[in-house]
Amino acid sequence: MLNIIKSKIKNTYKKKALNDENVSFYNKNFVPAVRDWKNSIYVYNKNTLSLIPVASRLVMKLIKGYFNSYNLNIESKLRNKRLRRRYRKLSTNKIFISEGEFKHTNDKINITLYVYNKQKLNYLAKLKKKYTSLFGKDIFIKKLQLIKSKAIGILTQQQKKSKTLTNVLPKYSTKVNKIQNIYYRTYIKKSIKRLKYYMYYKQLLYINKAKFENSYLQGLIDLIKKIYKKNIEFNIINLKYLYFNSDIYTQPLVLKLRKKRDLLRYLKDLVNKAKIEKVSLNKRSEYYFNLENLFTRNNVDITNNLLNNLMQYNKKNSEYLKKVILNDIKYKRVSGVRLEAAGRLTKRYTASRSQYKFKYKGNLVNTYSSIQGYPSSLIRGNDKPNLQYTKLNSKSRIGSFGVKGWVSGV
């Protein structure tokens, strides 16, 4: 076995020069299988593989339907007009979800989802604009005191009037009390109207938060269990910005183009949202080893000694390990975005020609491999490991159209 390993190393690892004894290599960045195929699975019966794409598509429909659910009773109280179902589907006030990454094992499936919670941000912005500025000032306290003083004045006046009415009309005392109660209720509703709307927004925020809790996710997990007949585990990653995932980045463009075909404006708005900063390229560390001394007895326990020294060093300096881990993570920053849209996208309602527009910011080049010459692996076909690519299609009243999106990292 040792001879086979030695022969493989001699064939794969070549020296830089004939006189050079040490061989230097850079760490090659291998992309996980889930990132490549969206499904990572090994089965003995190959016929079961044909059912997996259908099952994953059905599961993604269930997940998107769960996160797009809403409370009609509360939302109707906040709106003057009823929102139609078509416009609700086209609204960007929702939780955007990427395509799921499914990792299959014998008894469990790990589903990774990237989420951008636009709905939560919208509700928080409305609360901040309308209510938090009001509650933090002295105006709100003065208003409460005014409501209190007016209410006490109204009560005293009504008590005097009710006494005179009961003396004059003793038979109608019950009706007088009912009218008084209606008057009090209308006064309370008008005075605490803004506070009522504040409570509705708080309820919607609670519903939004509850969608990510285990107690509410359990119903969704039970449905997915029936499809796969395995245990389900969710790994939900909340994204800070829209452009961190290409699936999420292209979804708002499709929704906006279905509602109103103003292509160039929407492309500019989405591309300008991407914040791309200048990134300094660091040199990657090399590791050296001697082929002749690789399998000697002295180097057998080298990993154990290395880990022992690292643990002792980390006891003194805990921040060192954090720096090492963060430096080893690849594609942490966004280096470029690109959006393309083509199809029946003119503003007229006639069978016009198709349009093609694109906008980009930054670059999509794999900088470490193309500029500095470091080795890098390829994903399925000729796709680059630093790129995320999404292709979506949809249709409007005058015809169909397609949208493509790229997000590159460095």
UniProtKB/Swiss-Prot annotation:
Q: Provide GO CC annotations from the record.
A: mitochondrion; ribonucleoprotein complex; ribosome
Role played: Essential for mitochondrial protein synthesis and required for the maturation of small ribosomal subunits.
InterPro entries hit by this protein: Ribosomal_uS3m_fun
Q: Name one Pfam family in it.
A: VAR1
* Compartment(s): Mitochondrion
The protein's superkingdom reads Eukaryota
| Protein's name in the database | Small ribosomal subunit protein uS3m
Gene Ontology BP terms: translation
Q: Which family does it belong to?
A: Belongs to the universal ribosomal protein uS3 family.
Q: Name where it mostly resides.
A: mitochondrion
> Per UniProt, which keywords does this protein have?
Mitochondrion, Ribonucleoprotein, Ribosomal protein
Entry GO MF terms: structural constituent of ribosome
